[in-house]
């Protein structure tokens, strides 16, 4: 079994685990619009708010609860699902087909002049959309997540991009971190996913690096602040244990146009290393 399959199986087990006795899980539930809601008019791009409805009535070319996205299908199987009458036969059970197959299910009318990006952002991942892009940082010290560099300075690019949606399972974002100075290059590849209908959103990052470290980070997204804890580490025997933390927490949040990452790492003898980095966006992704 490959490392990717192992990490995926671990993620599924963590996300569908049975809650312990006495704990409560909160499910995201959308409330219907009220007269007061419609007075504030949350609908965008010419959409109409109607009391009693769950979403706005969108103008041509737009979709989403608030008409905030261009009208399009998210899944390539939408036309087939529509032929199988998936759009309406299970409408009372889920709104999956309404929001992910809006054109095929005739929930919106596309703009003929709009050229949609090849890879869309799945609606389930919209809480993470403000992290999308390529982010660059230049550090004056070797402090880094998950392991420090031996040099006293380095550069890093974090790339968070939409990924093709799977036929089954939760959608994800591609995640890549590249850090370098001279001949020392550290690369981390992985993906980010959210637990469906969780509130606040439960987030997981599964990653593997060219250092020989595989990780699972679990956390929550609250008020546009993503807090993650390392929940699983698989270490290659040849990896330098001196730079490997026993545990780590990192926090990502937007500060204006910048991305802030705050890290705390725990080492033996209760030694704690803390640092903060600021990233500037150098590229964006349309979705």
From Swiss-Prot:
Q: What does this protein do?
A: Plays an important role in determining body shape and sensory ray morphology, possibly by acting as a signaling molecule outside the expressing cell.
**Transmembrane region positions?**
1-22
Quoted from the entry, the domain comment is: The EGF-like domain and the SXC (ShKT) domain are essential for the biological activity of the protein. May function as protein interaction domains.
Source domain of life: Eukaryota
Provide the effect of residue 67 to Y: In allele e1599; hermaphrodites and adult males appear slightly dumpy, with males having swollen bursal rays and much lower mating efficiency than that of wild-type males
Tissue-wise expression: Expressed in hypodermis first at the two-fold stage and throughout the larval stages but not at the adult stage. Detected in the body seams after the L4 stage with expression maintained in adults. Detected in the male tail structural cells at the late L4 stage and also maintained in adults. Detected at different developmental stages in vulva, PQR neurons and several neuronal processes in the head region.
EGF-like domain residues are 34-68
Q: Which UniProt keywords apply?
A: Cell membrane, Developmental protein, Disulfide bond, EGF-like domain, Glycoprotein, Membrane, Signal-anchor, Transmembrane, Transmembrane helix
Membrane topology term reads: Single-pass type II membrane protein
Q: What is its main location?
A: membrane
SUPFAM superfamilies named among the record's database cross-references: EGF/Laminin, Lipocalins
Query: Listed disulfide bonds for this chain?
Result: 38-49, 43-56, 58-67
Where does the ShKT domain lie? Answer: 71-108
Write down what this protein is called.
Answer: Protein male abnormal 7
Where is it localised?
A: Cell membrane
């Amino acid at each position: 079994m490959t490392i990717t399959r192992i990490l995926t199986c671990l993620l599924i087990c963590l996300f569908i685990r049975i809650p312990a006795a006495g704990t409560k899980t909160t499910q995201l539930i959308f409330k219907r619009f009220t007269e007061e809601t419609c007075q504030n008019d949350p609908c965008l791009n010419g959409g109409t708010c109607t009391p009693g409805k769950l979403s706005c009535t969108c103008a041509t070319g737009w979709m989403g609860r608030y008409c905030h996205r261009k009208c399009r299908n998210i899944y390539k199987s939408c036309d087939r699902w529509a032929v199988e009458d998936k759009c309406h036969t299970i409408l009372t059970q889920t709104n999956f087909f309404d929001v992910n197959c809006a054109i095929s299910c005739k929930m919106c009318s596309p703009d003929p002049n709009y050229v949609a990006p090849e890879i869309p952002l799945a609606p389930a991942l919209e809480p993470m959309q403000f992290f999308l892009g390529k982010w660059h940082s230049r550090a004056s010290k070797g402090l880094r997540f998950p392991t420090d560099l031996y040099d006293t300075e380095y550069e890093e690019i974090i790339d968070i991009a939409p990924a093709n949606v799977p036929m089954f399972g939760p959608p994800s974002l591609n995640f890549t971190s590249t850090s370098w100075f001279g001949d020392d290059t550290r690369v981390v590849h992985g993906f980010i996913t959210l637990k469906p209908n969780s509130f606040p959103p439960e987030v997981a990052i599964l990653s593997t690096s060219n250092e020989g470290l595989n990780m699972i980070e679990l956390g929550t997204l609250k008020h546009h602040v993503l807090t993650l804890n390392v929940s699983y580490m698989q270490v290659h025997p040849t990896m330098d244990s001196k730079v490997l933390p026993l545990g780590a927490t990192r926090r990502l949040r937007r500060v204006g146009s910048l991305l802030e990452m705050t890290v705390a790492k725990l080492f033996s003898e209760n030694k704690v290393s803390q640092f903060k980095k600021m990233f500037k966006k150098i590229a964006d992704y349309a979705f």
